[in-house]
Each structure stands twice: as C-alpha cells, then as structure tokens.
C-alpha cells in the first residue's frame, strides 16, 4: 500500500515489479495454478492502486515448477487478462534459471549473484543475454555479510536463514 501511495503522489512514470507465490500454503508445485496465484495478483493490483503490474515474478517456486509448461501458461493467462504486462521468475539455482528461460515469454530472472556466488556468470548470464532476458541480482550483499556490519561473532535468531553458513 505504501508503494501505491507513492505511485499516486507523483506524475513520474513508475514501473512496478513484484513477486508472488511464496505465501502459498502449502508452498508446493500444485499451488502454482491460476486459481491460487490470481488472487495474490488481484490483491497486489488493489494494494498498489494500478490496473496492470509491469513485471510479476514467481518467487522461488518449487524446482519442478520451472519445467512445467502449465506454470507459464498460467502467467500467460494473467498477461491476456491485462493484469500483468510481463513476467519472470526468482530462482535459487542456475539450473532453475536455465530451465525457465526455455519458455519464450519469460522476460526476467532474479538470481543470487555476489562475490561468493559467481556460478551464474559461467553460463546463465551468456544464455540470458542471447535471449534478451533481464537479469535481476538477488542477495548482492550476501545477506548483509558484505556490508561490514557483521563479523565472526555475529549472532542471528534461530529462524534466520543466515544460520546455514555457520555450521
């Protein structure tokens, strides 16, 4: 809603990119269908106060979703309905990214890339460039590690995803 207020407050052209799917319960591949995803898109449209979302990304769906043509057909339906202009995916692995860009209407891929995670530069970036697919970098500061605000003694809450690096 805050972003929606910002959009209303300016005469400048603002392009909106958002993600959907992560709040599916349960979060599994079967949930990536029009009946489950469209209500999330509708809520985003309402909260943002826009008629169409410029870029809607699927937020790290289960791996099997990337090779399921129905996943992309669902997104194509949302484009046809005028609810989204373009769509992309947010991925965990290079393999998921390469699978997603096999589908012609995928316009962007959000992928982890930073000084510690360089694998996308080996193959994915080249393939994305060949297909003119936008790349959005995730976790560029390695979840805060590269900010200089953490050290070997930094402690995280028990449910903080950064704990996986400690062991």
PLM segments and residue spans:
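Conserved radical SAM core fold
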Residues: 20-25, 116
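Beta/alpha (TIM)-barrel catalytic core signal, keyed to glycine-rich beta->alpha loops juxtaposed to Asp/Glu
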Residues: 1, 6, 60-167
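Alpha-helix N-cap and loop-to-helix initiation/capping positions
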Residues: 2, 29-39, 66-70
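Short, acidic/polar
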Residues: 31-49, 91-99
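Active-site groove signature of glycoside hydrolases
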Residues: 45-64
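Short acidic capping loops at alpha-helix termini that bridge into adjacent secondary structure
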Residues: 11-14, 18, 51-55, 82-86
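Solvent-exposed, non-membrane alpha-helical residues enriched in polar/charged side chains
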Residues: 4, 8, 38, 42-45, ...
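A short acidic, helix-capping loop that chelates divalent metal ions and anchors anionic groups
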Residues: 23-29, 146
């Amino acid at each position: 809603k805050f972003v929606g207020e910002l959009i209303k407050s300016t005469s400048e052209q603002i392009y909106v990119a958002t993600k959907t799917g992560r709040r599916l319960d349960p979060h599994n591949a079967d949930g990536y269908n029009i009946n489950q995803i469209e209500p999330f898109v509708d809520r985003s449209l309402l909260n943002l106060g826009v008629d169409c979302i410029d870029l809607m990304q699927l937020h790290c769906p289960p791996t099997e979703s990337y090779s399921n043509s129905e996943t992309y057909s669902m997104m194509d339906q949302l484009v046809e309905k005028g609810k989204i202009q373009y769509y992309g995916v947010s991925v965990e692995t290079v393999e998921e990214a390469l699978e997603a860009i096999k589908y012609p209407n995928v316009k962007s891929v959000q992928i982890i890339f930073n000084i510690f995670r360089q694998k996308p530069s080996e193959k994915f970036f080249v393939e994305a460039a060949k297909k003119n697919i936008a790349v959005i970098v995730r976790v560029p500061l390695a979840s805060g590690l590269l900010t200089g605000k953490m050290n070997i003694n930094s402690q995280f809450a028990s449910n903080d995803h950064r704990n996986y690096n400690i062991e």
